[in-house]
């Protein structure tokens, strides 16, 4: 690595005269030379820890093809020295004067358009040097190919303080051909010419390209896999650069040196503790004595744990046989112990491949994140050392401290906060639990903060739960990206669900994928899973009213039963809750997207302790809610949602479960018209679909009904939907904003208001949290001008995670009178007035303007 790393002193003759950073605590200014050396140190550290050489070798083989040794060494030198050149532009005399308080060659100041900017100047320094080197190559095709990468790498440097813009926008600024008249690149080059002549005594600046069509079209004939490789490498280098720069700056400013980036240490010990847990011991004992059980004996088996154990061991065997593949599918019935199976598979990868030292567990909802954190706690909770390596990354949980309070005793607090923040920004945790949304920001977000943790994905295991919850309009793009990322970055991806589409039908990338449960029928058709719940369609003959539904439910609740009712629209759930609350003699609860994790836990605890209870809910109930009901009622939507819902009924399989389906609201309004799965012909209105729900033949459902339609839509002429156009136009040309827009998992709450309802909430441990105190703490923190930025950032994130339990999203048309507003959050002092006796939000208060005038 060091062999190709250039020394800044040999490239520029003023690196010790110019400064890169000024410290706030009276430390000496940091020279450009010192900062570059530190940045190189971190770049090399990341390179080694993450085995980036393997990524580059794979990229060269797959993307560059056969090139001369000379060109290959130059290509690698160009990549490695992105970090070397990233701050060269700080020699800018205006930067030195304005930002560093240092008078330096003011006669060579750039024009006012550039002002004190440095990133664009760094990028032309980089281009100037490497275009000169490329010129020396003999082969013209190699010269042109390497020039492409010189421009891409210089683009990365130009963006290391900002978000990722469209590559073409940057290129056009270099040639002055930008439609917006953006010509910073042209101005930067003119300044560099002058600078080289006056300061470095050099005359020439190599000629820049002034047309980009050939470069951008160069791979138009290529397969999508190569386009994903180009995107992944660009994002990886950008992520490594901003990480190295941040780590180096933190070391200078705060003295915090980062030695490891959250790799799992003492892997064997963790696996040992896992294998000693009661569940694992019983699985291993079964494996020695009975596994594999013959088909007949298994069909007669009445203990659901035996089936879970068989499935666990089947998946483990398949994985070991195919350990070199990259993408694995784990299709297993609801309630078959997928989470534990996935944990075991992650550890199996680590045992077999010592490069893999990081695990990401990724779920569709925060409730699932929380639930799986609880499972990990059950296994490792006694072991503090293991639990310091596990972190939940979302907005609901405070930032993790990976160090002992005692370690910081008497030490500089600011160093502690710096480390906590860096760990969170760069995902420096060995085991990360988070959501699909977080992962997609890391993979596709155009903001610098999004890409911070991208390099951490190299040599990791990513377990993706419930992938079918993504918009199916994105399935083809998702599997194409995932397969490319997995191959290039050595990621092992496990995709798991009870209703798993065969995504292979949607991609041209034919790299081997592995189905971990080869004999799915053995489990899906087993009475313990298939006959646990019976579906009843008597209410589906026509549209139903809420009154008719209520009457039917009251006919069922009599003899001590727990009943779950799911609506697909929140408004219907709320209306029905109010209606049935007035009539019902047993307890009634409501669970919607409004219910905080705390609220949900309380409701679940109450339900467990009662014999007769009614739970009214929205889709939040479909996954990750640990309840076991006797009877279910569900408004029909997508077949995979119906199956998920059935998983909430008769989970223990100890009695007969029943689910009634009804038709109330229009699913298109909820899931969007681009979801193939809500078309009437593939819903439970059709006899054929009812049969699939009974036989659990989801592969057939997807392969015959859904995937062909998704594929057809992806081939439509409409460029917004066309898969090929997206990869050829946006991915190949590195149109980062377009890629982010396309790969958005959900349309965010654009027109919603955040309202903070201050009240008292009782935590699980019985502690009472006062929302008014938390708001006051938040206000004081914002007003504190003296606190250091890093400490303030950490504390603000932590207080915001506490505030989430009090914040509700309301429509922009909501009527209310706030007591205070900070930023985009409206504060209401007497929040209690907005909840009923069950702690359920009374949304109608915000609709009719009665609000606080009570």
Regions inferred by a protein language model and the residue ranges of each:
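Inter-Walker segment of RecA-like/P-loop motor cores
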Residues: 383-444
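Accessory nucleic-acid engagement/destabilization modules that flank
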Residues: 2-285
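Walker A/P-loop
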Residues: 323-346
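Conserved Walker A/P-loop ATP-binding site and its immediately adjacent core
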Residues: 357-380, 394-397
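SF2 helicase catalytic motif II
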Residues: 437, 450-484
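Interdomain hinge/linker at the junction between the two RecA-like core domains of SF2 helicases
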Residues: 499-556
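C-terminal helicase lobe and adjacent C-terminal extensions/tails of nucleic-acid helicase motors
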Residues: 486, 551-560, 566, 571, ...
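Conserved helicase motor
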Residues: 392-403, 568-571, 588-602, 618-622
């Amino acid at each position: 690595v060091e062999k190709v790393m250039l020394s800044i002193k040999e490239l520029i003759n003023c690196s010790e005269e110019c400064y890169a950073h000024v410290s706030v605590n009276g430390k000496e200014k940091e020279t450009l030379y010192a900062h570059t050396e530190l940045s190189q140190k971190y770049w090399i550290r990341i390179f080694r820890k993450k085995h980036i050489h393997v990524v580059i070798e794979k990229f060269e083989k797959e993307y560059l093809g056969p090139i001369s040794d000379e060109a290959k060494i130059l290509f690698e030198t160009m990549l490695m020295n992105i970090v070397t050149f990233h701050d060269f532009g700080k020699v800018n005399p205006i930067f030195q004067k304005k930002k560093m308080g240092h008078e330096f060659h003011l006669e060579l100041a750039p024009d006012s358009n550039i002002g004190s900017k440095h990133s664009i100047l760094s990028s032309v320094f980089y281009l100037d040097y490497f275009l000169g080197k490329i010129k020396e190559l003999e082969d013209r095709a190699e010269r042109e190919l390497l020039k492409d990468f010189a421009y891409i790498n210089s683009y990365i440097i130009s963006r290391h303080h900002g978000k990722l813009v469209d590559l073409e926008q940057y290129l056009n600024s270099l040639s002055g051909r930008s439609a917006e008249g953006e010509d910073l690149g042209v101005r930067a080059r003119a300044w560099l010419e002058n600078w080289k002549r006056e300061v470095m005594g050099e005359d020439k600046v190599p000629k820049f390209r002034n047309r980009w069509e050939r470069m951008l079209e160069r791979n138009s004939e290529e397969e999508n896999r190569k386009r994903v490789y180009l995107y992944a490498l660009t994002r990886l280098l950008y992520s490594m650069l901003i990480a190295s720069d941040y780590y180096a700056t933190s070391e200078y400013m705060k003295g915090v040196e980062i030695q490891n980036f959250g790799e799992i240490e003492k892997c064997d010990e963790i696996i040992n503790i896992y294998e000693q847990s009661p569940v694992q011991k019983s699985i291993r004992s079964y494996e020695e004595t009975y596994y594999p059980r013959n088909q007949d004996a298994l069909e007669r088996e009445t203990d659901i744990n035996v089936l879970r154990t068989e499935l666990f061991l089947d998946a483990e065997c398949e994985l070991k046989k195919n350990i070199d593949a990259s993408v694995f599918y784990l299709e297993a019935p609801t309630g078959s112990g997928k989470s534990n199976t996935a944990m075991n598979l992650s550890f199996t990868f680590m045992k077999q491949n010592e490069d893999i030292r990081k695990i990401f567990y990724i779920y569709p909802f925060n409730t699932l994140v929380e639930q799986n954190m609880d499972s990990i706690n059950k296994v490792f909770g006694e072991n503090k050392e293991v639990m310091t390596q596990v972190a939940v990354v979302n907005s609901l949980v405070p930032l993790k401290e990976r160090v002992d309070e005692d370690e910081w005793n008497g030490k500089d607090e600011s160093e502690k906060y710096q480390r906590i923040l860096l760990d969170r920004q760069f995902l420096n945790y060995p085991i990360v639990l988070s959501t699909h949304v977080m992962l997609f920001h890391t993979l596709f977000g155009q903001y610098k903060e999004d890409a911070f943790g991208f390099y951490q994905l190299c040599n990791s295991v990513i377990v993706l739960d419930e992938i079918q919850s993504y918009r199916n309009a994105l399935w083809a793009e998702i599997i194409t990206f995932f397969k490319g990322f997995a191959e290039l970055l050595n990621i092992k991806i496990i995709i798991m669900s009870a209703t798993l589409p065969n995504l292979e039908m949607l991609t041209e990338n034919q790299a081997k994928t592995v189905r971990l449960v080869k004999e799915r029928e053995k489990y899906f058709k087993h009475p313990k899973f298939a006959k646990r719940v019976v579906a009843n369609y008597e209410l589906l003959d026509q549209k139903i009213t809420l009154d008719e539904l209520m009457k039917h439910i009251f006919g069922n609740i009599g003899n001590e039963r727990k009943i779950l009712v799911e609506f697909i629209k929140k408004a219907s759930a709320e209306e029905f809750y109010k209606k049935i609350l007035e009539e019902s003699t047993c307890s009634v609860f409501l669970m919607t997207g409004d219910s905080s994790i705390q609220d949900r836990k309380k409701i679940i605890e109450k339900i467990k302790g009662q014999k007769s209870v009614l739970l009214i809910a929205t889709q939040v109930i479909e996954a990750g809610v640990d309840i076991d009901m006797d009877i279910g009622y569900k408004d029909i939507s997508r077949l995979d949602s119906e199956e998920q819902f059935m998983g909430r009924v008769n989970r223990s399989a100890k009695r007969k479960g029943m689910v009634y389906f009804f038709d109330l609201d229009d699913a298109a309004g909820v899931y969007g018209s681009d979801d193939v799965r809500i078309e009437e012909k593939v819903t439970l209105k059709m006899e054929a679909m009812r049969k699939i729900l009974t036989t659990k033949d989801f592969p057939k459902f997807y392969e015959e009904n859904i995937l062909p339609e998704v594929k057809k839509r992806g081939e439509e002429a409409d460029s917004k939907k066309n898969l090929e156009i997206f990869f050829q136009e946006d991915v190949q040309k590195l149109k980062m904003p377009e890629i982010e827009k396309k790969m958005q998992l959900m349309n965010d709450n654009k027109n919603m208001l955040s309202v903070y309802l201050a009240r008292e909430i009782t935590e699980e441990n019985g502690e009472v949290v006062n929302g008014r105190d938390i708001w006051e703490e938040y206000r004081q923190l914002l007003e504190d001008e003296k606190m250091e930025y890093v400490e303030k950032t950490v504390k603000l994130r932590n207080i915001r995670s506490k505030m989430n339990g009090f914040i509700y999203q309301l429509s922009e048309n909501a009527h209310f009178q706030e007591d205070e507003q900070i930023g985009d959050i409206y504060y209401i002092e007497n929040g209690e007035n907005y909840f009923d006796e069950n702690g359920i939000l009374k949304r109608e208060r915000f609709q009719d303007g009665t609000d606080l005038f009570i």
